[in-house]
Amino acid sequence: MAVPKRRKSRSNTRHRRSQWKAAAPDLVPIVVDGERRLVPRPLVRYFQQG
């Protein structure tokens, strides 16, 4: 039979959550319609296709 995990205190939960940071995407310069733009690397292909 399944056993519930130990409950974490509110303080521990909030300290753990506060350590999480979103990383900014690395932007690469590309030229679109003669204009230089900074776009996230995964989207470069779509910008070049049109």
From Swiss-Prot:
InterPro entries: Ribosomal_bL32, Ribosomal_zn-bd. GO terms for cellular component: large ribosomal subunit. Pfam families: Ribosomal_L32p (PF01783). One of its GO terms (biological process) is translation. GO terms for molecular function: structural constituent of ribosome. HAMAP family: Ribosomal_bL32 (MF_00340). Belongs to the bacterial ribosomal protein bL32 family. This is Large ribosomal subunit protein bL32A. The lineage of its organism: Bacteria, Bacillati, Actinomycetota, Actinomycetes, Pseudonocardiales.
